[in-house]
A protein has these predicted regions:
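Non-catalytic cap/lid and distal C-terminal segments of serine-dependent acyl enzymes
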Residues: 1-250
Length: 250
């Protein structure tokens, strides 16, 4: 790994801002997390619970900033008028990670919250060989409701509500080619997003796709109070299954 000063810092990758966390003692297997942020762009740098877990497990974290892109393969004008968030992650973030940290799939785990939670699942479903390990906290899966409610950015990205629905993470699940390790959780008092997590669980179960989920633990609804509550379980899931992937291919 190229020497980086430990702690949080900001970099520019592919012309866009990106937050990095470097632990004092990185793990010996080049495990690394990519964190996908939510719609309000709140940084993990401000969340001591997550930072402590990353430090404890020796996990570098790369956290790209893509505005309200929903981590899709659609042009989001407030992010970039030429490149989608999906292409940015695949074409710029992954090569940057390999160059700077000598880490590459399947040693890269995805962690996301809210908009980024559905983004983590979306990437894992679309590219299960690249991202076999993903954890989503409060994933905003059925985000077509944002179109219905007049979200201007989503309306700039999609022609109608049905087009959004067809692009949701649930519709990207392949019954024969899925990520080997996925975890998602949602507070049952999260009135806006709990139903879409329940529908996702039902679809995965009906297809026989292995998954872990927690739709029972409650504590704060939708936001960082709940995200912090689920941080330890989510990071532990990622670390344990990155290790399983390493053992599987050695």
């Amino acid at each position: 790994m190229i020497h980086h000063q430990y702690g949080w810092k900001q970099e520019v990758v592919g012309g866009h801002g990106c937050d990095l966390f470097v632990p004092r003692k990185p793990n010996p297997h080049q495990y690394l997390l990519v964190y996908l942020h939510g719609i309000h762009l709140k940084k993990l740098e401000d969340q001591t619970k997550f930072t402590a877990l990353f430090e404890q497990n020796g996990l570098p974290v790369v956290a790209p900033v893509t505005q309200g892109s929903w981590w899709t393969d659609r042009i989001c004008p407030e992010f970039d008028r030429v490149m989608t968030a999906e292409r940015y992650l695949l074409d710029h973030i992954l090569p940057y990670i390999e160059q700077e940290f000598q880490s590459s799939p399947p040693r890269i785990g995805l962690l996301g919250t809210s908009m980024g939670g559905q983004g983590a699942l979306r990437f894992a479903y679309k590219y299960p060989d690249l991202f076999p390990v993903a954890a989503a906290i409060s994933p905003a899966v059925d985000y077509q409701i944002r179109y219905r409610n007049g979200d201007p950015m989503i309306r700039a990205m999609y022609p109608n509500e049905e087009a959004v629905r067809q692009d949701t993470a649930t519709l990207h699940i392949h019954p024969l080619n899925w990520p080997r390790h996925q975890f998602f959780c949602c507070d049952p008092t999260d009135e806006i997003w709990i139903e879409s997590s329940e529908r996702l669980r039902m679809k995965l179960s009906s297809l026989g796709v292995p998954h872990e989920c927690d739709l029972e633990t409650t504590g704060g609804g939708h936001g960082f109070q709940y995200y912090n509550l689920m941080a330890e379980q989510s990071v532990r899931f990622l670390v344990e299954n990155l290790e399983r992937e390493r053992m599987r291919i050695t």
